[in-house]
A protein has these predicted regions:
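Basic/aromatic-rich interaction segments and small domains that mediate binding to polyanionic partners
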Residues: 2-67
Length: 67
């Protein structure tokens, strides 16, 4: 997977394991990236275009669309 950096644009590509997931296809801008190395502990802060607030985890289904 391409490294994620602050300022990158990301898109949700599948169902997230969350009771109130971000809808598939939603895009946002990476605001911060945690310093954890594991795919299961890495956290990515995103400002979602729909106004929602929910971090991405490294194992969530998403792609970097521009950066």
């Amino acid at each position: 997977m391409k490294p994620v950096r602050v300022g990158d644009r990301v898109r949700v590509t599948g169902h997230m394991d969350d009771p109130y997931p971000i809808p598939v296809g939603t895009e946002g801008t990476v605001d911060w990236v945690g310093q954890w190395n594991s795919e299961y502990t890495r956290q990515i802060g995103v400002k979602w275009d729909n106004g929602r607030s929910l971090i991405l985890l490294g194992h969530d289904p998403f792609e970097v669309v521009s950066g």
